[in-house]
């Protein structure tokens, strides 16, 4: 899981500062020739992007700015990320909502057209297969984006259940948007910058909203969402127009929005207290344990009907045995798999993500601890490279979120 980043050499790992190496580069391939490239690959290289293996793709981990500077600039101005390695797809048909509700915990039927939500795909034991942002475009059209590292298993899972659903007469079909690229524009200048490139009034578009609109002359799927805790958008654009759109965004921001890589993206999501699948969520972790009970709609709690509902609903009623928590710690930054102990030195859990916060100038992390030891202020110890350091449980997000919502 973490081996690929070590192969990059000490020059890059030093520039990564204190970020958790495992969370950045995953599922590396044997050679550069094995890696997929987004349509912006040459654009990244021309702008100084340092390309690394990530989930089978060659992606920029950073540009000329340090990861710390890029993180802070996103919070103060804005960042543009290439997230085309992620997989966008649509489900269509009069039964697409009923079909999706068998696989995810969200109240999809309760979403108004043009709105969306974070949700979790679950397995029969209630564990998380992946997390995803889903949008109800219309009552018979759902748009969703799944993680790059989970693409193959997610698509196989959806296809398997779709075949069974259709065999019983269900009306649902799907399309995978391999012909599109995905850009994420994040930060306080995201709205004003993008407004220069569309006639759509973005001030009326709030967090979680979705539109199909013209941006810079291209038909785009626009979602007001992101992975940083800041206001921002994810823009699905025809691949042949992706480079032109990236150039236009950077130009309209007058240099304040900067290209940003995976390193800062990881720092930003950690500061925002957001899960990284494969670290903070796995197939043996339920949404309740991960602190995502809020994503399980009220109707779904009453009716169930999704995979693993019996396990998940019992955890909601009785409480889970473990819980995801935020962590502060002394010493070097905690890493994934670092042991968490109580004050007596007894094992109570494990760190899943950790790093140095560029904005808070202190070590932060996430992990799982036994229920009862999850309350903010609980003192604990973290074992890093055989040495024990003081730590404590804290609330998340570490940095306040700034999602654009109605006043």
Swiss-Prot record:
Cellular compartments annotated: Mitochondrion
SUPFAM superfamilies, per the entry: Aminomethyltransferase beta-barrel domain, Folate-binding domain
EC code(s) of this entry: 2.1.2.10
Top-level division of the source organism's lineage: Eukaryota
Entry function: The glycine cleavage system catalyzes the degradation of glycine.
Similarity comment: family membership: Belongs to the GcvT family.
Name of the protein in question: Aminomethyltransferase, mitochondrial
Native source species: Flaveria anomala (Yellowtops)
Name of the gene: GDCST
């Amino acid at each position: 899981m973490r081996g690929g980043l070590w192969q990059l050499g000490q020059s890059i790992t030093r520039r990564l500062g204190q970020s958790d190496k495992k969370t950045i580069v995953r599922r590396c391939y044997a050679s550069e020739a094995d890696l997929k490239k987004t349509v912006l690959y040459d654009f990244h290289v021309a702008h100084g992007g340092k390309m690394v293996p990530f989930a089978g793709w060659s992606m920029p981990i950073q540009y000329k700015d340090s990861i710390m500077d890029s993180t802070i600039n996103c919070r103060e101005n804005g960042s543009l990320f290439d997230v085309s390695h992620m997989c966008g797809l649509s489900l269509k048909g009069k039964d697409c909502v009923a079909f999706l509700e068998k696989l995810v915990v969200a109240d999809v039927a309760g979403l108004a057209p043009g709105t969306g939500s974070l949700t979790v795909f679950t397995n029969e034991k209630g564990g998380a297969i992946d997390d995803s942002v889903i949008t109800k475009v219309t009552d018979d059209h759902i748009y969703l984006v799944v993680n790059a590292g989970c693409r193959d298993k997610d698509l196989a899972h959806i296809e398997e259940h779709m075949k069974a659903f259709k065999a019983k007469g269900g009306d649902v079909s799907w399309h995978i948007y391999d012909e599109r690229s995905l850009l994420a524009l994040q930060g306080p200048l995201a709205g004003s910058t993008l407004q220069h490139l569309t006639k759509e009034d973005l001030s009326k578009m709030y967090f979680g909203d979705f539109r199909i609109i013209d941006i810079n002359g291209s038909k785009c799927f626009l979602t007001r969402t992101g992975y940083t805790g800041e206001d921002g958008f994810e823009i699905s654009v025809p691949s042949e127009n992706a480079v032109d759109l990236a150039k236009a965004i950077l130009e309209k921001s007058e240099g304040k929005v900067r290209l940003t890589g995976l390193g800062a993206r990881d720092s930003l999501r950690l500061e925002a207290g957001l899960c990284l699948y494969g670290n903070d969520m796995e197939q043996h972790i339920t949404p309740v344990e991960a602190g995502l009970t809020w994503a399980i709609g009220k109707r779904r709690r009453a009716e169930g009907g999704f995979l693993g509902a019996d396990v998940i609903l019992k955890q909601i009623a009785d409480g889970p045995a473990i819980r995801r928590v935020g962590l502060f710690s002394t010493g070097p930054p905690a890493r994934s798999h670092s042991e968490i102990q109580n004050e007596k030195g007894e094992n109570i859990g494990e760190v899943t993500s950790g790093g140095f916060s560029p904005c808070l100038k202190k070590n932060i992390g996430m992990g799982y601890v036994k229920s009862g030891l999850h309350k903010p202020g609980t003192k604990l110890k973290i074992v890093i490279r055989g040495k024990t350091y003081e730590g404590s449980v804290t609330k998340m997000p570490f940095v306040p979120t700034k999602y654009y919502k109605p006043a």
